[in-house]
Amino acid sequence: MAVTITLKTLQQQTFKIRMEPDETVKVLKEKIEAEKGRDAFPVAGQKLIYAGKILSDDVPIRDYRIDEKNFVVVMVTKTKAGQGTSAPPEASPTAAPESSTSFPPAPTSGMSHPPPAAREDKSPSEESAPTTSPESVSGSVPSSGSSGREEDAASTLVTGSEYETMLTEIMSMGYERERVVAALRASYNNPHRAVEYLLTGIPGSPEPEHGSVQESQVSEQPATEAAGENPLEFLRDQPQFQNMRQVIQQNPALLPALLQQLGQENPQLLQQISRHQEQFIQMLNEPPGELADISDVEGEVGAIGEEAPQMNYIQVTPQEKEAIERLKALGFPESLVIQAYFACEKNENLAANFLLSQNFDDE
């Protein structure tokens, strides 16, 4: 007797597939590919998750006792890396707006990074390792050629009410709330990366999560190889990046807004970060050498990647000053108000909502 399998993606898309109980998980993946398309859902890149476990290809569907009232989560990892070189990403032809400041081109060292096609021989387990592979879950890396790349960079990082929704969705996969919260925190609220952490192990967790044997073996590989190829290495000595890292470690929810601001003021750098998101997150997780004042990040996001350290002060119009004063009247420290105001692109209402949604500790 045929059964109906309900499947849901991390983008909240739901669809159904009819299966015979004796058909294997591999057959289910093939049916998903046939219905949703080989480019979006290749069999080799699919991971099916039910009750917190990855379904094995050669196991019949009946063995997992999937309740038709529940759903199976579909994740897709990038396995066909050659697609990145065969055709440009779909994008709007309009380029991202440039800031009035002249930005230097991204360092050529970033372009010497091995092309994706050179890594086609790697196994899917290597591509899903959270700390050693530059590949990431499909959809988690913003499109580098999009006119709205700063919005793309922030769109995969959820905050506010979306955070609670995504938290509930991931918990529905069979994970406890505490583990999901820890995974989201480690991934800076990136739901795709959080699920990867739940499957392969949360960085800094005392006990590794139970992923596949291959994934655990890959995670043990030394990170020196990836570090040696890091095209964002030049950021380490940038005082603006060091301040940004300190602020984000204190308040991870600021990352989407800061990335969006960076995309407006330095789109070339955001494009490079988008191509190497894994290394960028690793650098943000590194402990800072010196504790920076949280106010030091004000106005400096756009200066990251430049050689102009003179951007230490910002000028505000009388209207902007009045908005800052009104936000201060809500009871928040001036440094936090300024930080939130500029991180939210001088949107007073958005900044107020952000400040009220955070639990800042006055220093």
From Swiss-Prot:
Covalent cross-link Glycyl lysine isopeptide (Lys-Gly) (interchain with G-Cter in ubiquitin), where: K122
> Which Pfam families does the annotation name?
UBA (PF00627), ubiquitin (PF00240), XPC-binding (PF09280)
CDD domains reported for this sequence: UBA1_Rad23, UBA2_HR23A, Ubl_HR23A
Which portions of the chain have biased composition (kind: Polar residues)? 213-222
Is the keyword Phosphoprotein assigned to this protein?
A: yes
Q: What is the effect of changing L10E?
A: Impairs UBL-UBA domain interaction and enhances ubiquitin-binding
Described purpose of this protein according to its UniProt entry:
Multiubiquitin chain receptor involved in modulation of proteasomal degradation. Binds to 'Lys-48'-linked polyubiquitin chains in a length-dependent manner and with a lower affinity to 'Lys-63'-linked polyubiquitin chains. Proposed to be capable to bind simultaneously to the 26S proteasome and to polyubiquitinated substrates and to deliver ubiquitinated proteins to the proteasome. Involved in nucleotide excision repair and is thought to be functional equivalent for RAD23B in global genome nucleotide excision repair (GG-NER) by association with XPC. In vitro, the XPC:RAD23A dimer has NER activity. Can stabilize XPC.
Family of the protein in this entry: Belongs to the RAD23 family.
Record comment regarding domains: The ubiquitin-like domain mediates interaction with ATXN3.
Protein name, as recorded: UV excision repair protein RAD23 homolog A
Give the organism, scientific name.
Answer: Homo sapiens (Human)
Q: Which gene encodes it?
A: RAD23A
